[in-house]
Structure formats: structure tokens, C-alpha cells
């Protein structure tokens, strides 16, 4: 249900902003005196007087003038948002977004009838395809053009690709309203409605077209990089025949796929759209914070799509180093780096759901991990009822596994080794698994020698010729405990020390925290054991 205030504003159309007998430079505002409906009115004489006094040093700091100035700011923002909404309803979000992007009109100025005409003409030009014309690669010299409207005349001037500061807030406001409208529609979608109504959904103001238009606004605002990276990850997820970013267009590969897709395939596609819609609520929440005065986010956790065992508020996932599958699906795993070089993949214990376990297995197979190191003790696995996915034979979605135990004699039976065969379609891969059965949570291993021995075992695991270190997220060891921060960070740091005992452990910890989250290597006793291992290695190399 719409709030009462929103319902009152719904009666305002573009014609509401045209006032006969009023100067074209008179400030407009939304009034609601003596009526249950809002209406557009010219600024009152008393308000003009207070505005004039606010320009005089003697009066501008008085309480009445300062209060008036704040009221004017709120009024200006409200009427601009309402006007842009009226424009959007008539010309569509894409035309309004493009016009705001390309226009150099100052959106911080009070809304007047002159400004109403200028913005409307700019949107009409965008709606008529003028934006596309000046963006066309054949139009040399106007690739980075801006529309400048003066007295109704339109000309083209050079500018960079970033939207002007005065247009950022209106763009975000339109995107916020668009997301609030489209997300519930996407959540209500099912396979039948997708097949029957796709053309409507992917055109005009349909939810899929509208969604892509609103999300496109973010890459025009440099400060919104984290938000843009987040939505880019979501748009790059493969659904059916193409990436989700292509689902806002009719007549292409997506529409042809929908026509031929089975009921099961459509159900799976809708399932992905539902989880993406849920993730987009995080973007809406960030927009709300920005609207309330917060700065653009400087960091963001990556989308988890329901695959993570823990909430990102507990175990953060750096979106810049988040691992993604070949179909674009992000998994709750990060690439740990030290000194700019990948060390290992790190994550929490896989969530005990079919989708999460399938994604985890696909990652092991696609990334051809040199080994899988499970650091969760046997006691903890039983106490928390964690799935022993790495031993036995299972089918997780499209992935089939068959794991055979190789040995358990090493280090007094503390480490079990398995060879786990993975298959998915035509792809096959066998990965060695090391299960450390006696490493308590938040504590070090029983001995420093066992930590060094384990590091050697991980480094020497080299299945199918995969290198132990890589320049990408392939052919790296995959390490996890329960949360993927303490024991996992300790194991990865031990690998760094085996490569170079002179490595600065404080810097290793800092780099791991930058590449995954600020909880990496958080347990003091485990860090002390790393220092002891480093001392042993340095003594050995010196002798």
C-alpha cells in the first residue's frame, strides 16, 4: 500500500507544473493547504522576502531565516522528485535517466516553469532518440557530448562521461523508486507468467526493462563504484541462454530461449531471478542511506545469493576478490593474496543446502584446485552436524562425487587424506583432500611441527600437473574451517612462510584482511604458533 503522502502526490501530472499568469522564473513548490490533494503553487511573497533576507549578512544567521532556508531546501527536493516522477510516468525511466546523464542543467536550482520546460525538452529529445544519435560512433566529436539547453535551444558541448554532481541525486532517486517498484514484481514472477508476459516485462516500463535501466544509472556515477560492482556481478549471472543483463531486451536470445524452454528450465530461471531480486534489496537499502545523507559506500560485501553459511555481517566477503563460477555465479569464497600474489582460496564450511554444496563442488572442479584442506575437527563437525561432503559418493545438482580414502596414518592419525573424483557433464577432475581432525576452533594445532607438516602436505599436493601457486584464482589450494578466518588464515599464512620464511607476518595478516575480511588471523594463540613456525624455519635455513 502507498503511504498517504505518496497517494496525494499521485495526482500530479506534467500539466500540474504549468501555471498560467505566473512568471517563468518564480520558484514552484508543492502545497496542500485546505485540500486533501497536493498541488503545485508559486512561491508566496512572504517566502520571497525571507529568501531575500537570507542573502544579507545581517539576517542570514537568524533563527527564522535559517529555518526558512532549510524548509526551502526540503521543498525544492520534494518538488523536483515529484516532477521527475511525472516525467518518468510519461516518457519512461530510460529517457529521463539519459536526459539527466547528458544534460548540464543544474538540478540544484529551485524548480521554475523555465526549468520545467528545459528539462522536459531534454527528456523529449532523449525519448526521440537524440541521445542515441549523439552517442553513435559515427558522430565524431560528440562521443562525450552533453546537451545544453538555453532558452529552449539545444546544442552539443564536450564533456567527460561522468554525470554532473547536481544530477547524481535525481538519478539515484529515480533508481530507488524504480527498484522499489520492480523488485516486488520480480518476486511475484513464476514460470508461466514469464513465458506468457516476457515481451511486456522486457519493454517499456516492464519490470525487467525498468530494472536494467535503473541499474545502468550507477555506472555513470564514479563514487558509486562499489554499488555498480555489486549490481554488475548480479547482471553477469547466466540465466538460461544469456546473462541476466540481457533479460531487459525483447527479440533476442533470451526471448527465443524462453519460447523453447521446458517448464523445469523456466522454474530454475525464475528461481535465480528471485534470489537476484533479494540481493537487490541490499542496493535499495544503500540508496535509502544515501538519500538520508550517508556517503557512497567505500566497501561492500559481495552478493551471496543464499549460498553462504554465515551472514556477511558476521563473516564478511570482500566483493573485489570474490570467486565466481563460469556462469557468473558468485560463491562465498575469496582469493587470499600476499604481496599481490594469490596464495589460496578461503571460505567458510559449505552451507548444508543442495544449491550451496553444488556451487562449492563446481568451484573445486572449475578452478582445478590443487587440493582441498578441511581444517574443521571431527568433533566440531559432529557437534554442528556439518555435512561430510568430502568423503563418500554424492550427487549435488549437476555434480557427481566419489571420494576414496587414501591414508590416515600421518601425524598420529590426525590427518585423513582422500582422493575425490568430481564430474559435471563432460568435465572430470580428481582433487586430493586433507582433513585435519584435531585442530580445535580458536586454538593452535597441538604442535608447531604439525602446522609445518600440514603446510608441506598442502604445498606438495599437485594433482594433474596443477601448479601450487597461480597468477589467477585457478590451481590454488581451497582452504576452509568453520568460519574461514582463524584456522584458514593460519594455514594460508603457513604456506606463505614455506615459500619465504622471511615474510613479514604482520603484513601477511594485513594483506589477508584486505583480500577477504578484517577477521582474518584474529586468534592470538594461532598467530603465536605462526611466529614459532617462522622461527623454526629461519633456524633451519641458517644452519
UniProtKB/Swiss-Prot annotation:
Bacterial Rho-GAP domain: residues covered: 162-293
Catalytic residues, chain numbering: 481 (phosphocysteine intermediate)
Cell location: Secreted; Host cytoplasm
Cited function: Effector proteins function to alter host cell physiology and promote bacterial survival in host tissues. This protein includes tyrosine phosphatase and GTPase activating protein (GAP) activities. After bacterial internalization, GAP mediates the reversal of the cytoskeletal changes induced by SopE. This function is independent of its tyrosine phosphatase activity, which remains unclear.
Known partners and oligomeric status: Forms a complex with SicP.
Source organism: Salmonella paratyphi A (strain ATCC 9150 / SARB42)
Annotated InterPro entries: Globular_prot_asu/bsu, Prot-tyrosine_phosphatase-like, PTP_cat, SptP_N, SptP_N_sf, Tyr_Pase_AS, Tyr_Pase_cat, Tyr_Pase_dom
Gene behind this protein: sptP
Name of the protein in its database record: Secreted effector protein SptP
Record-linked PROSITE patterns: BACT_RHOGAP, TYR_PHOSPHATASE_1, TYR_PHOSPHATASE_2, TYR_PHOSPHATASE_PTP
Additional note from the record: Requires SicP as a chaperone for its stability and secretion.
Record's keyword annotation contains Secreted: yes
Annotated region (Chaperone-binding), positions in chain: 35-139
SUPFAM superfamilies in the cross-refs: (Phosphotyrosine protein) phosphatases II, Bacterial GAP domain, Non-globular alpha+beta subunits of globular proteins
Annotated ranges, domain Tyrosine-protein phosphatase: 315-543
